């Protein structure tokens, strides 16, 4: 389009030249001279058109190359950004794996060694072992069970023996009118006293009750204690834990006489129903 416009401009500019040649005062200007003049003009126009077209194409040849270079640069930048992002992610994964698999275990090992050395220096190496609390089962049983099981246990035992309802409605020991059930236990000695043992009663409800006695106390005091807790001797008996056997007492025997010379756990058990 630009070359055509230029050709048109040169054609319009050639008309004045043609008019000037005609006005030079050559009356004998013939057809041959006009043809030569027009040929020169057209030759000049063709030459100019060729020059313009070549110049235009040469100038336009630089534009696509520049656009192509810009596109290539943008693609290269995007590619480099993507590569850098992948490298950063891979490096981050390597760092996290190193921290998790190497650095963290190493720090934990160093800390454990320092802790072991500290306890060895202070003489508290027992803290490095997995210990357990003594008597933990009994304490758990004591905490987990409720305090209201006296009348329930008596009532269930009476039902299994098909006893009348009047027997099951047993009042607390303190309210019993009979002299036998109003029991007075000896005063509990202090822990620092000599010749003292601790007796624990494991009740059917799961409770574990403890009390201190002098070894010289009568063995009958154990059954009095059981009665005061609400377990009648007609329904329940005492037995040792290991070996498991009924506790045998006699009148005039002390706790030391029946073998209770150290801290002991006794079981309150239901008596077997006689046929």
Swiss-Prot record:
Region (Disordered): 137-181
GO biological process: ERAD pathway
The UBX domain, residue ranges: 192-268
Residue spans, topological domain Cytoplasmic: 1, 55-275
Residue ranges of coiled coil: none
Keywords, ordered alphabetically: Endoplasmic reticulum, Membrane, Transmembrane, Transmembrane helix
Keyword match Endoplasmic reticulum: yes
Entry GO terms, CC: endoplasmic reticulum membrane; nucleolus; nucleoplasm
Membrane topology according to the record: Multi-pass membrane protein
Transmembrane segments: 2-22, 34-54
GO terms of molecular function: ubiquitin binding
Lumenal side stretches: 23-33
Matches recorded under InterPro entries: Ubiquitin-like_domsf (IPR029071), UBX_dom (IPR001012), UBX_domain-protein (IPR050730), UBXN8 (IPR017247)
Subcellular location as annotated: Endoplasmic reticulum membrane
Keyword Transmembrane helix: yes
Function: Involved in endoplasmic reticulum-associated degradation (ERAD) for misfolded lumenal proteins, possibly by tethering VCP to the endoplasmic reticulum membrane. May play a role in reproduction.
Subunit and partners: Interacts with SYVN1 and VCP.
Protein name: UBX domain-containing protein 8
Species whose genome carries this gene: Bos taurus (Bovine)
């Amino acid at each position: 389009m630009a070359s055509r416009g230029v050709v048109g401009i040169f054609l319009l500019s050639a008309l004045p030249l043609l008019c000037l040649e005609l006005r030079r005062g050559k009356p004998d200007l013939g057809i041959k001279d006009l043809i030569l003049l027009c040929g020169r003009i057209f030759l000049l126009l063709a030459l100019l058109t060729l020059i313009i077209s070549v110049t235009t194409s040469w100038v336009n040849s630089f534009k696509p190359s520049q656009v192509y270079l810009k596109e290539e640069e943008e693609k290269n930048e995007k590619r480099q950004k993507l590569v850098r992002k992948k490298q950063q992610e891979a490096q981050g994964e390597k760092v996290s794996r190193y921290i998790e698999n190497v650095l963290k275990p190493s720090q934990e090992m160093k800390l454990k060694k320092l802790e072991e050395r500290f306890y060895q220096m202070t003489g508290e190496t027992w803290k490095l072992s997995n210990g357990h609390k003594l008597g933990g089962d009994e304490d758990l049983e004591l905490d987990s069970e409720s305090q209201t099981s006296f009348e329930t246990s008596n009532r269930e035992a009476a039902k299994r023996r098909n006893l009348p309802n009047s027997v099951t409605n047993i009042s607390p020991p303190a309210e019993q009118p009979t002299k036998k059930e109003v029991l007075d236990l000896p005063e509990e000695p202090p822990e620092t006293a000599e010749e003292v043992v601790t007796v624990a009663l494991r009740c059917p409800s799961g409770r574990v009750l403890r009390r201190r006695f002098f070894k010289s106390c009568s063995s009958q005091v154990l059954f009095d204690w059981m009665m005061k807790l609400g377990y009648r001797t007609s329904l329940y008996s005492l037995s040792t834990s290991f070996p498991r056997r009924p506790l045998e007492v006699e009148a005039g025997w002390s706790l030391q006489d029946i073998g209770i010379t150290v801290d002991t756990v006794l079981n309150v058990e239901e008596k077997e129903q006689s046929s």
